[in-house]
């Protein structure tokens, strides 16, 4: 078995002496140092670990990436692939696919792992659901993933906008299966309101990422609550037992194997059907450092452990991300649909399509690694 690359690095909680700035204007982005520098948790003087060979990503040739970006901009859509600096962007874009974000490009949270900008979001764009649905229909997509930034400024956390997008896609592309990757809808009464709204038009797959083990939440997901996320997943499943539920975690933030296994058990105990496990990669030097690169053998062992717990599907590997090959995760988990996708070229079989990805809508949310709230 390949030996893991491990480094124990102390993280420092420091006083926030970052100079105060004027009130944020709607839509103005804080990223990198501007975003993380205002967090009470700082990562000072942390050396960068050398990436192992299994983390390398091949950059494909051709102009497919630029072509898809142009199409997205034409429809005023933004992908999480771009906003969260996903390492799989070239593979996915070169095959004409992406994961769309809705509800803007500015997040109300300051998660230390995520490269999505922080700030004061603009009001939801009422035209976005139609733009998204039109793009999905034009591209002939059979499976889409819709995610968002956290919208703590909205009474329903953005749930109604998710439903509007689901309804618009089903109107324009009725054969398309829809997975939503939601924030946690945390706040007084917000989860209740969000679940009531989603009940009117539930997705085909409901995804919410716990992101990491509970002990690391103060450093990794300030503003979030581990048990709250588990409760959201369980309550949605109880409300919609026929809809597969899904969650994801990142590795390399300082967690132990026992903690990861305990988190997998927690997810299964809260009726989660599918899980993704992938390596965290540091977006910038200001973000949470990578404290360990887990090996391919360890990811394989976690996949086997998860399947033994009763998950219908476990996607575990260094480059696995929450929406990466989401269509095949859903299909292998028993969600029946034709995974063939037409993107203006000859149809691709499900087997050939395994090297492709998925799609969803505007704005920002998830993370450089797995994203997900």
Swiss-Prot record:
Pfam family for this entry, one: LIAS_N
Residue ranges of the region described as Disordered: 12-36, 346-373
Entry EC no(s): 2.8.1.8
One GO MF term: metal ion binding
List of residues binding [4Fe-4S] cluster 2: 107, 111, 114
Domain Radical SAM core: 93-312
Main location: cytoplasm
Cofactor, free-text remark: Binds 2 [4Fe-4S] clusters per subunit. One cluster is coordinated with 3 cysteines and an exchangeable S-adenosyl-L-methionine.
Pathway: Protein modification; protein lipoylation via endogenous pathway; protein N(6)-(lipoyl)lysine from octanoyl-[acyl-carrier-protein]: step 2/2
Enzyme class, first EC level, given as a word: transferase
Similarity comment: family membership: Belongs to the radical SAM superfamily. Lipoyl synthase family.
HAMAP family: Lipoyl_synth
NCBIfam families associated with the record: lipA, PRK05481.1, PRK12928.1
Full protein name: Lipoyl synthase
